[in-house]
Amino acid sequence: MLSIIILAAGKGTRMHSMLPKVLQPLAGRPLLEHVINTSRLLDPDEVCIVYGFSGEKIQKQFRANTDLLWAYQKEQLGTGHAVKQATKLISPSNKVLILYGDVPLIDATTLKTLMSEHQNNEISLLTAILPSGTGYGRIIRRDNAVQAIIEESDASEIERNIKEINTGIMYCDASQLDDWLNRLNNNNAKGEYYLTDIIEMATNDGTKINGIQANKWEEVMGINDKKELANAERFMQKELAEKLMAQGVSLADPNRLDIRGKLTCGTDVFIDVNTIFEGNVVLGSNVSIGPNNIIKNTEIHDDSRVHANCHIEGAFIGKHSEIGPYARLRPGANLSDNVKVGNFVEIKKSTVDRGSKINHLSYIGDAKIGRAVNVGAGTITCNYDGVNKYTTEIKDGAFIGSGVELVAPVIVGKDATIGAGSTISKGAPENSLTLERSKQMTNEKWLRPKKDL
């Protein structure tokens, strides 16, 4: 049986932010969410979050996770004190794994290795070799066995040169852990209760300390400031890009891709540079995404293409469709197969059926467009009276000329044609030409005003 404790009580002063450190975004999700998601891959019986600073914000962020346990650390008295708050809530007969809300890159495979190599009556400790150990407790070994952890503030000059550091991640019996926590003291430079002090305590008790090194030091990086957050972002984006390419996705430049959520791709997908994917995005097979796009919570189906500089959110795009360049699809844009949406077209909360085209400079809002409809350049659905939104319906085969205003609520009939420059407010019957224009006039005696020189 497994209990997981995640420490998330720190204020994160070096972030210089009103947002708690563990809620800072990484790849579109809070730091703590990454750790919780990794925890779930280990199939724990219980997950306990230790919170403190701005705890109400943290709990609100994860209110949908009703299975989480919450332990409050009122005073920031060190990691040992924080873990003690959680051991009051977890089962004493379980094994316990301690993780950190500001160490979001930790891989589930690494944690499974840590636990699989654990023996009874010992502590399994995750360590790492860092280019620089600055900011971390150093691992003290004797005959290759871990003997102690020295916090940097208490380390000698020789000890500070040690590259193997303590990640803080450990695995042991909950009952043993609680016993050691009860024996901690705060006789150190910071006057805090260090979780790391239990290592020396356990060694003195004859308990073996099993130190397991992480494969990549980056996955145990703690995030304390915006620079470290940016470094973690680049590392995670690199990892995500490599996973996509391993699945067969073609990336024009893996270093110029941002995934801020979940991206699912079919076969033979191509993604050009500087595209941002947010939320849950699904790309079907043989989909091509041009450069400089923002795509959020959208499905794009097989053989469709998005040209450069489009903004797409909350949309559904069917097969063999073409979007952009410079198009905007807002939430509720639902496009069927073989649909063309061209440059400077905005679509909001509208359905566009198979084979229809909206090629240039148009606004389509709260509309229902049938099959094989041609919407001319500069067409506007006038859907809002200042209070209410109204629907425009354009039926199959209709042809809308350029510069047309459709004043909703209005219906354009099947195979109807609307003449260019018309303002249509009373509907248009099927199989007919409908146009509405003011009389053209020419004043041959008119003189253009001129500025005084």
Q: Where is each model-derived feature located?
A:
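N-terminal nucleotide-binding beta1-loop-alpha1 segment
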Residues: 1-17
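Hydrophobic targeting segments
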Residues: 2-6, 32, 46-49, 225
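Residues at the starts of beta-strands that form the adenosine-phosphate
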Residues: 3, 45-47, 95, 122, ...
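Short catalytic helix/loop segments, enriched in acidic residues and glycine
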Residues: 18-35
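Conserved N-terminal catalytic core of the sugar/cofactor nucleotidyltransferase
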Residues: 30-109, 113
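Conserved core of the sugar-phosphate nucleotidyltransferase
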Residues: 56, 66, 106-189, 196, ...
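Conserved alpha/beta core of the MobA/IspD/sugar-nucleotide pyrophosphorylase nucleotidyltransferase superfamily
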Residues: 165-266
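Structural signal for interior beta-strand "rungs" in well-ordered beta-sheet cores
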Residues: 250-435, 440-441
